[in-house]
């Protein structure tokens, strides 16, 4: 790493950026970021300007010697960067609303990282991430790209499957939330060493063991969650329903809250349909929260991250991002839960898959934790199904072909009819036209047929 530490945040006008900056300020003594560049696109400029002003006030208030820059020119920012964080949303929140509302209008779950909605977020995002990777390879080839952009698993799979770039790590806040839940319910002290055996795919992870100071307390934790005495960890954008005792005991694993979309599909769909018919979707809630946040951010007296940001649903985002960068920069060999290719360490899945699992993180990036060599056979059917969906989705994002989109939709367990898959594909490709430039030929054909 260079003497100066330059971090570039793509999607710098995001409402999450103050949390990221707060994380850098808190860790400045061991992670001395000298330059932070905030990059956005023309459509995000008004938000970028507000975020930049707030971040400058936060830096001045903290008294750290960090230089802050803003630009719409990604290439200008990337030159000689050490770390690049990606937190972009192609099409911004209006595109997310389409991802949620169109599937719901056909009677299917509408969610930005699963099913039809997750597919179309991936189709919009993957080509943009590939463009960023190309720029990184040219302008800062030794930089690490730390990706927070959803769907993180699909994006990581696409980068490793279709590019030669190897310094890419997909990060999610869900495992951090699970870790904080465990610390809380087991009443651990800061000095207690907590190690978690976590495995699966992004937004489809399971915990199979929890070690406190080297001793397993998983049975106690599982029993508490199964019996309902311990309330399992959830996130802001998912309705809080408990998994049944029978499911938890039969799995003998702790599933993350996103698995509600698979194990409680009927209940989750009923709740979402109820919200939809009342005229609401999660994207609309988020847009209201965002509007309020940016009004707060404009206040020239505000010099710290406001507490209201926690309503946005990105809890522990800062800890996840900053600690990953910290572990690499300082060669900490610390335990993290990230998306990477496992390179054959897991003996019962293909060697080239990107997975989300417990890893050791240091100067050379992330390596799978030596303790985890086998994914639990009980959930391998579901994992294989979703990985097939991710691979098909990443292929479709590159090809721009209607039939590749159709294949991905038909492989998703959240789409139950081949006829509906075709209707969804047509409607969603046309709805997202301006954000799917590599589907231009496909869109022209669809319009002609229409």
Curated annotation (Swiss-Prot):
Mn(2+) binds at residues 172, 203. Substrate binds at residues 96, 150. GO terms for cellular component: cytosol. Divalent metal ion. Manganese, cobalt and nickel ions enhance activity whereas magnesium, calcium, strontium and zinc ions do not. Pfam families: Glyco_hydro_4, Glyco_hydro_4C. Its EC number is 3.2.1.86. The keyword Magnesium does not apply. The active site is at residue 258. It catalyses: 6-phospho-beta-D-glucosyl-(1->4)-D-glucose + H2O = D-glucose 6-phosphate + D-glucose. The record marks 112 as: Increases basicity of active site Tyr. Keywords: Carbohydrate metabolism, Cobalt, Glycosidase, Hydrolase, Manganese, Metal-binding, NAD, Nickel. InterPro entries: GlycHydrolase_4_CS, Glyco_hydro_4, Glyco_hydro_4_C, Lactate_DH/Glyco_Ohase_4_C, NAD(P)-bd_dom_sf. Induction: By N,N'-diacetylchitobiose. It is an enzyme of class 3 (hydrolase). It comes from the Bacteria. GO terms for molecular function: 6-phospho-beta-glucosidase activity; identical protein binding; metal ion binding; oxidoreductase activity, acting on the CH-OH group of donors, NAD or NADP as acceptor. Hydrolyzes a wide variety of P-beta-glucosides including cellobiose-6P, salicin-6P, arbutin-6P, gentiobiose-6P, methyl-beta-glucoside-6P and p-nitrophenyl-beta-D-glucopyranoside-6P. Is also able to hydrolyze phospho-N,N'-diacetylchitobiose. This is 6-phospho-beta-glucosidase. The gene is chbF.
